[in-house]
Design a protein with these regions (language model features):
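Short beta-strand-centered aromatic/proline hotspots
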Residues: 56-67
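Beta-sheet entry/capping signal
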Residues: 4, 45-48, 59
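Intrinsically disordered, low-complexity regulatory regions enriched in Ser/Pro/Gly/Thr
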Residues: 40-42, 54, 95-97
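Short, basic/aromatic beta-hairpin or loop at an interaction surface
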Residues: 11-28
Length: 157
């Protein structure tokens, strides 16, 4: 059974939405309490990426379970071979605080200035790295409308 999840982009010194969007991943790390949740995502799960202070910026399907940043590849090439806006993603790459990256196929994504949000409308957001959207009907309907997608169809593919 595939899940539908909220995932916090968690921008900071180690990651940025632009890299996540361009290279097809979401990441978490710098302590196991942050990386552990993203490591529970399974192939086929659908995620809605949330960028704090902006709103929802993408909906994607997990294509592979999360791996340590040193092992993450795009088209067979290690991530470090690409020109990242946020190369600090490699901080602590060799210890338990490593970033873990889950690879995604972005179904729909937008840049930060076009993030989807409606104030005072009870849309789900959280400080958590990952949370289920299963009982967040209002947010699911908002995402379907704003990103012009149908979650039921995404799960039948």
């Amino acid at each position: 059974e595939k899940g539908m999840y909220y995932v916090n982009v968690g921008e900071g010194d180690n990651r940025c939405w632009e890299d996540c969007r361009e290279f097809g991943y979401l990441s978490a790390g710098q302590h196991p309490k942050y990386s552990d949740p993203i490591r529970t995502l399974e192939k086929g799960d659908v995620v809605a990426a949330y960028l704090k202070g902006h709103g929802y910026v993408g909906v994607g399907r997990v294509t592979n379970k999360a791996v340590r940043v040193n092992d993450f590849k795009i088209k067979g090439k290690l991530l470090g071979r690409y020109n990242l806006k946020m190369p600090n993603i490699y901080t602590n790459a060799n210890n338990e605080n490593s970033e873990f990256l889950v690879s995604l196929d972005w179904i729909k994504s937008v840049d930060r200035k076009n993030a989807k949000w409606k104030s005072k409308s009870n849309l789900f957001s959280s400080q958590l790295v990952k949370a289920s959207l299963e009982n967040q009907q209002k947010t699911v309907e908002f995402l379907e409308r704003e990103f012009e997608i149908n979650f039921k169809e995404l799960f039948s593919i």
